[in-house]
Amino acid sequence: MTFIIKKVKNIFSTKKINNKTNNNNFKNENLNIKNEILNNNNNNNNNKNNNNNNNNNNNIENNSKNENFNNFNKIHNSPISSPNLSPSLNSIDSINLNKIIIQNIDNFETNGNILNTSSPSLNSSVAKNNFIISDIQDIDWNNLVNIELLNNNINNNNNTNNNNNNNIIILVTFYNGYDDFNQVILKSSNTMVQDVYASVLQVILKYPVPEMRLIDSCEEEFNKMSINLLKQSKLQSEQLFNIIQTQIEKPFFLIMEYKNGGKFFSQLNHKEYFSSQKNGEKKLKQLGKLLSFDLICNINNNICNFNYNNCNNNNNNNNNNNNNNNNNNNNNNNNNNINNCNNNNNNNISLNNSNNNLNSIFNNNNFNIFSNIIFYEQPDKNGWYFGIIHSSILCLNSSSFTPGYRNTMDRIKLLLFSIFQNPTTESLQIYHFRKYLSNNCNINLPSSSVHWSTNIQNGIAKGIDELVNSLNYQVFASTKQIVNNMIFSTTDQNNNNVIINNNNSFTWKKGIDLIYIPFLFDVLKEIIIEHSNYKNKSKK
């Protein structure tokens, strides 16, 4: 099934495909794909022999790259033969297709860790951003020419054994001829349902969420995507191939619109980017608005983690006595039963360890602060300088009876009180966040740091105002129902909605059950109370 999130207020366009139709076409298509793999295997065995001869002749590097590009064209242009497969292969269903791909992929042409298989003219055109579009609908997966990991935490990690527990965000490039390139973002996730839920809420709040659609492993397109991702990643590097191989075992992928020319937070010249000459004040306020969303959906993973006096004491003791610091950390964990001050010795921001997903704003890798955001020099048509490439929710199933519930609410109250009480004064939480960026990430903000902080705080206050006016219990509940019906939904003879039962639908249902509306609403109520107190005080 597919869905599209449109960047229009409260409009969600859902494309549904009846799973009960075209079954024969689906099977035939899968057989054709399998047969294509077998044909490619035979072709590429010959290619391997050619490469061996090339290596023996010690051809120069440029000739080797050209040979690989030719082989790439052979792979992608090889005809799909008719499905005259043996009975044993005919009996293999679509669920096992990825296993066939993985078993046969080694027969594809490779040559070490080639980082780019495109021709020099293609590379130069991409570098100049000529004729680049981002069309998530009409994708010809056979035209895939490059894969780039956008997750710095995976990209910089040589250990790929545990990549199945990670989520990847990759940029894929398609060459459609005549210097026409299409670039889209692909995202896999262990918590796809929660990610989609958060994205829908962000659309309601008019945040810069890209157009996106969801595909699942029961679809024909998913198989075509998997085949071409494996082919191209094998041509580029063994590490990338291993990552892709584990990710395509997940049941869902998001295809997202991509706007080129952006940077991650760690790549910015922060003093220049947030300077007054470049609308730095507006950028900081927008960043604050995104932080306000995390107060609801990522409470264990946001700016509130900088508000504990015990954390401050531990950081000070860290300079004097590491043993005392360890004891303080243990006491905090026992008393609060939540990961607020965890790992202060390593100066890590605390995370909810029960979740493996990418963190919406912060990440335990020092170089992945604001890792879900791409920063742009020029605003989009709605005035946003950012693009959100990852959304998620933490602490979904907490209630008043779970450890840390009251602690969570107190953290929200303390942050909002400090911001609303003195909006023009840098709050303690923002102060420690700024110090963290400077001391741990080597990110030095503009010299007028208090101005930087107060703009962030003003953005949080503005974001809170929009949250209070846009969200309520009914919105949380109806959004959950929207996400529940996004895929595997069809109609019976009486036009009643029916959920199709298969492995993917069960996985989706489990994700839906983890979205605990009462907790989200309790958090919102605390925010509403603090917001109301601030408004009443302002009127006096």
UniProtKB/Swiss-Prot annotation:
Residues 37-70, 317-341 are annotated as: Disordered. InterPro entries: Actin-fragmin_kin_cat_dom (IPR015275), Kinase-like_dom_sf (IPR011009), PI3/4_kinase_cat_sf (IPR036940), Put_AFK (IPR037469). Gene3D superfamilies: Phosphatidylinositol 3-/4-kinase, catalytic domain, Phosphatidylinositol 3-kinase Catalytic Subunit, Chain A, domain 4. Residues 27-68 form a coiled coil. Disulfide bonds: none annotated. The keyword Metal-binding does not apply. The keyword Cytoplasm does not apply. GO terms for molecular function: kinase activity. Keywords: Coiled coil, Kinase, Transferase. Pfam families: Act-Frag_cataly. Belongs to the protein kinase superfamily. AFK Ser/Thr protein kinase family. This is Putative actin-fragmin kinase DDB_G0287957.
